[in-house]
Curated annotation (Swiss-Prot):
<comment type="similarity">
    <text>Belongs to the Hfq family.</text>
</comment>
<dbReference type="GO" id="GO:0003723">
    <property type="term" value="F:RNA binding"/>
</dbReference>
<dbReference type="GO" id="GO:0043487">
    <property type="term" value="P:regulation of RNA stability"/>
</dbReference>
<dbReference type="InterPro" id="IPR010920">
    <property type="entry name" value="LSM_dom_sf"/>
</dbReference>
<keyword id="KW-0346">Stress response</keyword>
<dbReference type="GO" id="GO:0005829">
    <property type="term" value="C:cytosol"/>
</dbReference>
<feature type="domain" description="Sm">
    <location>
        <begin position="10"/>
        <end position="70"/>
    </location>
</feature>
<dbReference type="GO" id="GO:0006355">
    <property type="term" value="P:regulation of DNA-templated transcription"/>
</dbReference>
<comment type="subunit">
    <text>Homohexamer.</text>
</comment>
<protein>
    <recommendedName>
        <fullName>RNA-binding protein Hfq</fullName>
    </recommendedName>
</protein>
<dbReference type="InterPro" id="IPR005001">
    <property type="entry name" value="Hfq"/>
</dbReference>
<dbReference type="Pfam" id="PF17209">
    <property type="entry name" value="Hfq"/>
</dbReference>
<dbReference type="GO" id="GO:0045974">
    <property type="term" value="P:regulation of translation, ncRNA-mediated"/>
</dbReference>
<comment type="function">
    <text>RNA chaperone that binds small regulatory RNA (sRNAs) and mRNAs to facilitate mRNA translational regulation in response to envelope stress, environmental stress and changes in metabolite concentrations. Also binds with high specificity to tRNAs.</text>
</comment>
<keyword id="KW-0694">RNA-binding</keyword>
<dbReference type="InterPro" id="IPR047575">
    <property type="entry name" value="Sm"/>
</dbReference>
Length: 83
């Protein structure tokens, strides 16, 4: 039986999007973008910042830092313990 793949990136981004948690996105060139994640796909993140929408390519992102802890629960993806 195969284990389900946990996609931490999607779970994290989806949680900050759903809970409207402000984030700071650090880019590889040192820039910082602050705002709310409004959407994402395999290659981009849509960030709303100061009333504008920004499409940020994921390959340019080094870190996404939420303003408060993100409550991601991966308990359903854990393998059952054997007794």
């Amino acid at each position: 039986m195969t284990k389900p793949q946990i996609n931490l990136q999607d779970a994290f981004l989806n949680q900050v999007r759903k809970e409207n948690i402000p984030v700071t996105i650090f880019l590889v060139n040192g820039f910082q973008l602050k705002g709310m994640v409004r959407g994402f796909d395999n290659f981009t993140v849509i960030l709303e910042s100061e009333g504008k929408q920004l499409m940020v390519y994921k390959h340019a992102i080094s870190t996404v830092s939420p303003l408060k802890p993100v409550s991601t629960s991966f308990s359903e993806a854990k393998a059952p313990e054997k007794s």
